[in-house]
């Protein structure tokens, strides 16, 4: 058994060498034939060889047979093609199955030095798990299934986890403030069908109960720049909080690297009963334009008209605008740098409240160094402080997070990672009596998630799928 890794390496090396020799023979034969074939015939053969090689190397997106799977973000959103994938894959005769997820076991203290009265601490385990499947339909069709589950209601608690200055949703009739709400047990159950209608052109329909409408950037759990941070951004409800929507339908059109989408969906956030299915209303709308100018960039701009998103403020409708830029650069087979910049704003009850997020993750083999900066504007009502501030002023909130983690072991394509991070919050002057001038948060965690799929593994997986089909 101790020689098994060497044998596997030799087998993989031999396979790669054989494939290289085979490709070299193909190129030599093709060059020889080109000397005797007419120009058009030679060009046709070269195009066929290029298309075959491209097909062999690329696992396709769930929403296009012409795009790489690496481009798929959450819902129907895009990330850069350069984005590596952390998942397991299993191929059957006609289907490709994918498993993805993350589990944090941590201790979280939101006010280490007890500077204020709003911090909290607890042991908990934020988590989420995905199962995805897809299959080709005829010559130009593609059918896909997406599911996502979270055991947050059990491992975090129905009231969520402590997070200073976080707002959004309710529990036991009160607004959740300085806490991040738990995600629902059923976070996504959606299906999609894509039809290739012309070269580099797709039309698709995605429906979910729950699902994610075409609004905002990919949700934070599915952004490479945020995957190491267990916390939701303070700007979550300004940009990507609609990722769990009970009732959504999205129609999209893609031409090359440009995509236009529109959604109709339920504006109301999930209720405090995290194990059931909320009533679908289909009373809200959104539109999103996505552009990937190169394999390293993904850009989007979107707008949503949300009807009564918060149960605590049922008469408050929200106009949400977002814009984002995501950049990913591979530095090696297991090293990369990923950066995301997001601007989001909510316009409601006559005010426009902006939020800016900048996050980055530098992965160097087994060690990751990551950070997040946020600026968020929230009013007294959102922080549940109307009694203290009758005129409901806006407060400017800033927070900086730095963290580091290291992969301790990889067993059966699964990483065990240990990390720690700290957040420095900058309190507005009027809120210092409650929060302190600069409360410091700290957490330490163990993380379990699928290991990085390297390029050689993705090529072999796709070749196995082609052989099965």
Locations of regions flagged by a protein language model:
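Repeated loop/turn-to-beta-strand initiation elements of outer-membrane beta-barrel proteins
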Residues: 139-143, 199-203, 257-261, 295-301, ...
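Surface-exposed coil loops of outer-membrane beta-barrel proteins
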Residues: 156-290
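Residues on the lipid-exposed face of transmembrane beta-strands in outer-membrane beta-barrel proteins
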Residues: 87-88, 101, 129-135, 189-195, ...
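Residues that define the transmembrane beta-barrel architecture of outer-membrane proteins
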Residues: 95, 120-129, 183-189, 243-249, ...
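Outer-membrane beta-barrel translocator/channel fold
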Residues: 154-161, 168-185, 303-312, 336-357, ...
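Transmembrane beta-strands of outer-membrane beta-barrel pores
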Residues: 103-111, 149-155, 209-213, 255-257, ...
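N-terminal periplasmic/intermembrane-space "pro-region" immediately following the signal or transit peptide
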Residues: 18-104, 120, 134-137, 146, ...
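Outer-membrane beta-barrel "beta-signal"
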Residues: 402, 436-469
């Amino acid at each position: 058994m101790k020689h098994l890794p060497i044998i596997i390496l030799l087998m993989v090396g031999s396979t790669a060498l054989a494939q290289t020799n085979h490709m070299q023979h193909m190129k030599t034969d093709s060059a020889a034939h080109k000397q005797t074939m007419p120009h058009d015939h030679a060009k046709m053969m070269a195009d066929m060889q290029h298309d075959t090689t491209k097909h062999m190397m690329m696992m396709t997106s769930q929403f296009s047979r012409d795009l790489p799977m690496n481009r798929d973000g959450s819902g129907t959103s895009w990330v850069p093609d350069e984005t590596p994938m952390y998942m397991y894959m299993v191929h059957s005769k006609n289907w490709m199955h994918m498993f993805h997820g993350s589990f944090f076991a941590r201790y979280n203290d939101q006010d280490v030095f007890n500077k204020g009265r709003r911090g909290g601490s607890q042991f908990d385990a934020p988590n989420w798990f995905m199962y995805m499947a897809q299959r080709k339909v005829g010559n130009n069709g593609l059918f896909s299934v997406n599911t996502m589950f979270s055991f947050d209601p059990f491992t975090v608690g129905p009231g969520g986890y402590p997070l200073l200055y976080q707002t959004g949703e309710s529990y036991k009739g009160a607004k959740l403030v300085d806490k991040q709400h738990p995600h629902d047990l059923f976070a996504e159950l959606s299906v999609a069908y894509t039809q290739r209608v012309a070269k580099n052109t797709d039309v698709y329909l995605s429906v979910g109960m729950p699902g994610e409408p075409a609004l905002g950037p990919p949700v934070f759990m599915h952004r490479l720049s945020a995957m190491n941070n267990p916390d939701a951004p303070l700007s979550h409800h300004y940009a990507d909080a609609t990722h769990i929507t009970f009732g959504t339908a999205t129609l999209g059109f893609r031409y090359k690297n440009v995509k236009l989408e529109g959604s109709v969906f339920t504006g109301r956030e999930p209720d405090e009963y995290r194990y059931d299915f909320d009533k679908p209303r289909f009373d809200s709308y959104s539109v999103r334009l996505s552009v990937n100018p190169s394999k390293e960039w993904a850009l989007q701009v979107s707008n949503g008209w949300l009807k009564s998103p918060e149960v605590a403020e049922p008469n408050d409708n929200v106009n949400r605008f977002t814009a984002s830029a995501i950049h990913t650069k591979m530095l090696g087979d297991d090293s990369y740098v990923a950066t995301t910049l997001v601007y989001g704003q909510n316009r409601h009850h006559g005010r426009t409240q902006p939020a800016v997020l900048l996050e980055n993750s530098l992965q160097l083999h087994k060690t990751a160094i990551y950070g997040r900066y946020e600026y968020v504007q929230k009013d007294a009502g959102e922080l549940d402080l109307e009694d203290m501030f009758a005129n409901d002023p806006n407060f400017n909130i800033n927070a900086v997070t730095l963290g580091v983690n290291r992969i301790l072991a990889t067993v059966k394509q699964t990483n065990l990672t240990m990390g720690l991070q700290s957040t420095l919050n900058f309190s507005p002057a009027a809120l210092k009596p409650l929060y302190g001038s600069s409360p410091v948060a700290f957490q330490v965690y163990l993380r379990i998630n699928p290991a990085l799929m390297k390029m050689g593994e993705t090529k072999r997986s796709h070749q196995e799928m082609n052989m099965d089909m």
